[in-house]
Amino acid sequence: MSIKDEIESRKTFAIISHPDAGKTTLTEKLLLFGGAIREAGTVKGKKSGKFATSDWMKVEQERGISVTSSVMQFDYDDYNINILDTPGHEDFSEDTYRTLMAVDSAVMVIDCAKGIEPQTLKLFKVCKMRGIPIFTFINKLDRVGKEPFELLDEIEETLNIKTYPMNWPVGMGQNFFGIIDREQRTIEPFRDEEHLLHLNDDYELEEEHEITKDSTFSQAIDEFMLVEEAGEEFDNEMLLAGELTPVFFGSALANFGVQSFLNAYVDHAPMPNGRITKEAEEVSPFTPDFSGFIFKIQANMDPKHRDRIAFMRIVSGAFERGMDVKLQRTNKKQKITRSTSFMADDKETVNHAVAGDIIGLYDTGNYQIGDTLVGGNQKFSFEDLPQFTPELFMKVSAKNVMKQKHFHKGIEQLVQEGAIQYYKTLHTNQIILGAVGQLQFEVFEHRMKNEYNVDVVMEPVGRKIARWVENEDDIKDKMSTSRSILVQDRYEQKVFLFENEFATRWFEEKFPEIKLYSLL
């Protein structure tokens, strides 16, 4: 197979949703169809000892939530699929945001009983901003939920995107009979013992079946006819432009509607996209020379070996193990001899990969999130990845002073992952951590204890707002007040931590010569 054919066979997507909509369960079932796993662990069944493949970290298995992005790869038909299962919890939205920089499409999972929820809306807006095509899977049809038309209206009105139902449910909850496939004009029954039923051109079953006597069936057929006659036409160009979302109904937990979704996804999802450089030029995936960028760093995927993996999205050309590449930030060449593919925490050596693939590079501290790696004599760097402004701040120290070495190593590695942000006071060197949400602190504390054997003491600093300084040379010590703390971030940039909005405005009025700015 040529490099061009290999690249065109890649499908790389993220799954986004509000917590508990069924995102991780859908991921598991897709892996089952890809033959990547034999048995799906369910999120709810924590007592059974089975855990979701994508929830590989100990804290995830204990809590039944995803707090880090996982990468899973499998082959399906003639396609090579990369799934990025993102943190569902809003406190980890920064990790999710960066993950969305590395995909070509997204699957939005919606709980049929709850519709569009806050985290779904937030992540959808990121996809929309980036022009990422979105596929929608409306989940849990075997439970009572909102009516299908109500859900479609909610998607269209809340998200300002057109919908095209690829299938249509016959009932829901206890009366859930199955789904009508629009393209095949078949009804797939929910019960295993039933076989496919076929509709003729007049929307009638081609064979006798007791379901025709049920009002649920006649209502579903009426709705389906209305969708066929008055709904949107399917337009693949609109899908690729992020203006239309194909909608699939099903139940991930019951493994129903998942394979038909996967079949449609590989038919319609885009092949790998290029990426824009800082020089505002696009690098095509078919550019012969290799290029890629680091979008995530994960420490301790194997706690026994204290390893660190840098996740790289290949943007162009082909990667070969042992090749020489240049890290643009340092302008230094390096030979990549240790590279890996993923099934959550299971790893396998990668000798060859192409544009669209996600691979892991063993990291001894060389890489940072957002780094560009290139082959040949290429000189560009890709655009920086976003960083969020934290809203919560805690002082942190080791409970046992004899554990300082492990304490500092743990902080260094977890900060480099981008899971938490690091600050240090200028004169006392007190470490302050910043987070978007409280759960980040809880996970940090848990991982320090379990992965680095360090108990930490955390104490709020009473500050809620971080503002970076453009003109650092104009700062004077007296500008730190009882309502603000002057600190440095991990890149030694000056940052003021303010008590509240009032304190921020007071500072800006008192010191107009100091130019402050925030991140995302």
Curated annotation (Swiss-Prot):
Residues annotated for GTP binding in this entry: 17-24, 85-89, 139-142
Family classification: Belongs to the TRAFAC class translation factor GTPase superfamily. Classic translation factor GTPase family. PrfC subfamily.
Location(s) in or outside the cell: Cytoplasm
NCBIfam families in UniProt: prfC, PRK00741.1, small_GTP
Which PANTHER family would you find in this protein's record? PEPTIDE CHAIN RELEASE FACTOR RF3 (PTHR43556:SF2)
Known function: Increases the formation of ribosomal termination complexes and stimulates activities of RF-1 and RF-2. It binds guanine nucleotides and has strong preference for UGA stop codons. It may interact directly with the ribosome. The stimulation of RF-1 and RF-2 is significantly reduced by GTP and GDP, but not by GMP.
GO CC terms: cytosol
Which regions span the lipid bilayer?
none
One GO term in the molecular function aspect is: GTPase activity
Q: Name one GO biological process term.
A: regulation of translational termination
Q: Where is the tr-type G domain?
A: 8-273
* Major location (coarse): cytoplasm
Extract the InterPro entries matched here: EF-G-like_DII, EFG_III/V, G_TR_CS, P-loop_NTPase, PrfC, RF3_C, RF3_dom_3_sf, RF3_GTP-bd
Tell me if Nucleotide-binding is a UniProt keyword of this record.
Answer: yes
Protein name, entry field:
Peptide chain release factor 3
Q: Which Gene3D superfamilies match?
A: P-loop containing nucleotide triphosphate hydrolases (3.40.50.300), Peptide chain release factor 3, domain III (3.30.70.3280), Translation factors (2.40.30.10)
Question: Which domain of life does the protein's organism represent?
Answer: Bacteria
Cytoplasm among keywords: yes
Query: Which terms are listed as keywords in the entry?
Result: Cytoplasm, GTP-binding, Nucleotide-binding, Protein biosynthesis
Disulfide-bonded cysteines: none
